[in-house]
Amino acid sequence: MPNLQQTASQSQHHLHPHHLRPQQQQQQQQHHHQQQRQQQQHTHHQQQHHSDFPLPDGWDIAKDFDGKTYYIDHINKKTTWLDPRDCYTKPQTFEDCVGDELPMGWEESYDPNIGPYYINHLAQSTQLEDPRQEWKSVQEQMLSDYLSAAQDQLENKREMFDVKQQRLLWAQEEYNHLKLAASRSSLCSSSSSMSRHDPELLRADLMLARERVHQLKQELTHITNDISYTERGMNTLYSVGEKINARENGCYDIAEVQAIHEEMLKVHKSLVSGEKVREELMRSLVQIKNELGRQQISEENSDLASPFDRVCVASQTDLCGSSGDNLNEGARFAEMAKTTLQYAEWRKHIKKLQQQLADHVERIEPGQLESDKDRILLIQEKEKLLNDLNSISLKSRSEEEKRVIHQTRHKLEEDLKEAYEANNTCVANRLRFHEEKQLLLDKLQEALKSTKLLEERLKTFSSESTFSISSGSSLGSLVHGQHKSALSFTDIYIDPFAVDSPIDVVDLRRRSQRLFQQHQQQRLHPVHPVLQQQQSAEVTLSPRSSLSMETPPASPMKYNAGADQTPQALKEEPTYANALHAPPAYTAPPPVPISGVRARPYDLDSTVLDCMMLEAKLQKLNMGTPLNLAVAPLSPISEKPSLLDLPQEMLSRSSSTSNTRSVSAAVSNESVAGDSGVFEASRAHLPRKELAQVQIGLKYLKQEGVLVVSLERANNLLALWTASADNSQVYLRAALLPNSLTSIRTKALGDFQKPVFNDTFAVPITLDKLLTKSLQVTVVTMTGQKEEIIGTVQISMAEFNPEDSTLKWYNVLSSKFIPSFESLDIPSTSAAAAAAAVAASNAPNPGNNREESSDESTITSSQTSTLTRNQAPCMELQEQIAAELMGLGPLNEPECSDDDDDDEEEELEDKQLVSDVGLMNSSSMLHAYLQNMKQEFADKETNTDRAYLPEKSRGQSQLMDDRPVKRSQTFTPSAAVSKNRYNCRLNRSDSDSAMHCGVAPHTFQRGAAERRSLRYLSKAPKSVTKLHHTHIPRTSLDLELDLQAQHSKLYFLNDQIAKLQNLKEVLQKACDNKDPLVAAWAIENEEFQRLVARADPAKCPEERQLQKLLMKTAKEIHKLRKTKVPKGCPDLVSFKEKITFFTRKGLSVPELPSEFTLPEANPIEEEEEEEDEDEFYNSPETAIAINTALVASSNRNKNLSEHLHRATSGAVPKIPAPVVTPAVTPAAAPAATPAATPAATPAATSAATPAATPVVSPAAQPDAKAADAPIPVASNDAEQQRFDYVVDRNYGVEV
């Protein structure tokens, strides 16, 4: 048995070989011939093995219980792992090593959890770093450089705090002067001649000044939080560097690495449980916010129809599978081939965008954007302070105050000039790169939306086939059982939920430059925007005046549009209040619902087959040529009568906010003239009984990207229907042409005279695509199982104004005016056919019940396929296309899985969301379709009806064997099909019905015992352990940064939970008391709206799925960038992202202001209440104090940085981590939010109290579900005491 001293130990005597590498570099040119001679000797040594040399005398070989060889020295009575013959075959030092060699005494080993590590048998130690590389010294230098840059960034934040504090001083002084004037005005109110100012104007100015002071205080609080966050991150980085440098060799041994790894897993479990608590709290806040919004609705609107009263009238039965025999198969498969081609192009576009983003990441320095943002914000703050000083009246000021104000102005102007010169030379290129990156991100998001839409459509096509996509057929679904034992880079440092949306620095810089140019040109007068006046609703003498009014009965569509919005979002006028809630230009637009299926209460059902069938029929019509009609139809332009001619009931329901443009309703010469602007429309007639008309409402929601179509009612449809209407029903069907993805239909009614449908649907479509389409509404009658189109309405969306909503009557063009219009027999859209479809789906199908597990089933299915080879060509081609759809991976399947296994659990979670539909070869699809339409089928004397192309020849057009070959109907693609498509052939000599054509043919053995119907040469399972987990080296500094990042995330997660619980209690109390002030804050506060928008349950599943796709795309971009790193070389960008993670601002939870929770006092009475508080600001030496603070700002920052440098370079006192017992609830602990006061310094205001917030221990249970209950804390964690917390002496910030 070997001695334990040879195994991995925790001795502090480590060999540090790094000092040998510089010597090798210095002597490389001097001893070049010596290195060549050593290489020749090394080549000679490599040819010699241990077996070529005998063991020395007194040595013996033995094996341990695990099979590892060790050696016994009988002379010294010792055991060792080292072969005594290594002195003949291995180099002695690192200088003698060539290539990837290790010297004598060193060994490379592998651990399944931590990866490769190295053993020094001579020093009896282990370490994580590769002794042949100098990556550790490069990391230390990068960390030191970043800390210097972060110190500059912190000084910019402190200077910004000083400038904003000076602005607060001036604002407070102005507020005090206004209060004094208001009090004097109130005392002299009895005599108007003694009052110099209007009391009402003074009160209004006082309120504005008060709001300004309140806003500046809030901004000071935000800056204080930023300073505290940055200081905490910097102190964490300082402590990590000190901890690594404190070790003798600067490396962790294998035992410490394993302990850190276990601790990271514990913290990760606590993070998972804490995120569940946070999500539950945010969902509760969404509910409370909605309740507060409902309380804000006035009583006069209480009688309006609620947007939630609408019930989805979409079809609840899947009618696709039972109508395959009666549908136009040609149009359907042609559309499928076109969709597949588009899907392939979008996939290529996504890969290209990912590659471009991976290239852009290398061009942008991590953390540089935040520094540029702080510089630009500092410039803006100085500009605002300069404007405040310029607006001060100097009449009542003393000479000393005037001199100080002039000096301050001059100093600010010089600072701004220098800052602009520096920014123009340094920041321009970085901002250009950032702007390009943002553009690529927007394109990537749009590409993902379009690709997901095509995926849903392909999934709809595949659902019509006899094959069903099972959840177990996805690749990798059987290998997810093992628990992931390692945390990757993306698991730790990519957390989109915890990071606020980035600020558009480009727009910020442009605005700052405009302000500077205005100041340089002395254009300080305010620019008032031109107010757009609303159009008058009066009737003019022009015939076109009727186009500016509508005949709109009150439609539920106008209220359903805001079913998932706040009451403020229902306001469509571009007011200032709406501008506050509108997302800024730099933020990504909200995810657009990909499909209309179950997206909202009024959503439609994706009856794609009905719409495609309708398009196929309409393509046969000659709509472009003029029709010689015996009776000319009326003008299709939707004219509106004068208000004098309208009935009283319609006059009372008219609206003044209508569309000013007309919409074509049918095809005629008058409609073309009307659209061109030449035709002067005559006075519109009132709806007459002999005309068939349909009332349609249209509204476009820009934020959601949804067109709301309201099919309200119809009038006199009997004019279109000549048969008896006793046993018939009528319904409306609508679709956006051309290339419609969805069709919508209303419920069927038996009333042909005045049917009232009142059905509202939402069609997700972008605005640019909407303006190129036409809305076609078809009137369909249903008699039993026979359906017939009796009329149609065509509305050009090019004339639709998306800024306004319309509700109009449209004339219906009868189908008898079109000679080639055929009746449509669509049993799938009737209720009787729905029942028949359900009965047919429940009937047993002998062909589909068979399985491929036996040879008998294969023989039987081959006989069936041979007899029915030339029958039902469309269904066979449908099965073929469905099989191809199943044979490809999903959209978000990672391309490179050789280095990271971190996506396995996420793929398992997304298996229910992401459809298992992929890319198909468009050329083979079209060729198969043409061959099917020609009724040409190959007879290869086999029982295979589908020839799967191999992976390498997907894009090549095959001239031979391209015709679809029928195969067994019982064959179902297995999980392996999702990666490699293959040709299914019958090898009669071996009785294999589906053999891979890509593998080498095996030798035939007659009478073999194994089953030959099984797949030959199945793919071997992936090995559990890989020898090289990643080719990028990892050091102890990386490991310590990962651990501290996890602890930082846990700390801020607990802080967020405490703030969310406090906010929930306050809002819930205000909701119960119906407090209007708190309700107004919850609805109008932008920060709170952004917070609750992350967890709004009203989001459709497609939006959540798109967010997951974006997250996976970010991980794929990281993998693409990592593949560019040469093997063995460090990843510099990833390490920079690690260290910038600590100073990156996380998710901010807004705090409810105390002014909104208490009743607001009278401004004059409040003067007495705040008299003591404002004594500091009533000093006549305010201007001198401001100038003194401005001059001393830079000196104080220098002193602070020197103190911080001395504190971090010297001995730092360490204290044990605070332990919070589970009895302390988050609600009882005060929130650790530093409150900034105007008189406070940044050093004092940045002091945080982390001990006051509840702490989630790494041993917390992951199944914590209660939102109000604190996460349990472990009491016995001896390993956690190893990670100390450092307290900065100057600022008191605990790390």
From Swiss-Prot:
Keywords: Cell membrane, Coiled coil, Cytoplasm, Membrane, Phosphoprotein, Repeat, Transcription, Transcription regulation
A single GO molecular function term of this UniProt record: molecular adaptor activity
Domain WW: 53-86, 100-133
Coiled-coil features, chain-numbered ranges: 200-228, 334-460, 1048-1075
Amino acid composition bias (Polar residues), ranges on this chain: 540-549
GO cellular component, one term: cell-cell junction
Region (Disordered): 1-59, 540-559, 840-871, 889-911, 941-971, 1153-1176, 1247-1278
Any one biological process term the GO annotation gives: positive regulation of apoptotic process
Cell location: Cytoplasm; Apical cell membrane
Source organism superkingdom: Eukaryota
Biased composition (Acidic residues): 895-909, 1163-1176
Gene3D superfamilies documented for this protein: 2.20.70.10, C2 domain
InterPro entries linked: C2_dom, C2_domain_sf, C2_WWC, WW_dom, WW_dom_sf, WWC/KIBRA_Hippo_Reg
Record's compositionally biased regions (Low complexity): 856-868, 1247-1274
C2 domain span: 690-810
Start-end of Basic and acidic residues biased regions: 941-965
SMART domains: C2, WW
Chief place of localization: cytoplasm
Role, per record: Regulator of the Hippo/SWH (Sav/Wts/Hpo) signaling pathway, a signaling pathway that plays a pivotal role in organ size control and tumor suppression by restricting proliferation and promoting apoptosis. The core of this pathway is composed of a kinase cascade wherein Hippo (Hpo), in complex with its regulatory protein Salvador (Sav), phosphorylates and activates Warts (Wts) in complex with its regulatory protein Mats, which in turn phosphorylates and inactivates the Yorkie (Yki) oncoprotein. Kibra acts synergistically along with Ex and Mer to regulate the Hippo signaling pathway.
Family note: Belongs to the WWC family. KIBRA subfamily.
Self-association state and partner proteins as the record states: Forms a complex with Mer and Ex. Interacts (via domain WW 1) with Ex (via RXPPXY motif). Interacts with Mer, Sav, Hpo and Wts.
PANTHER family with a match to the protein in the record: BOMB/KIRA PROTEINS, PROTEIN KIBRA
Protein name as it appears in the record: Protein kibra
Organism phylogeny: Eukaryota, Metazoa, Ecdysozoa, Arthropoda, Hexapoda
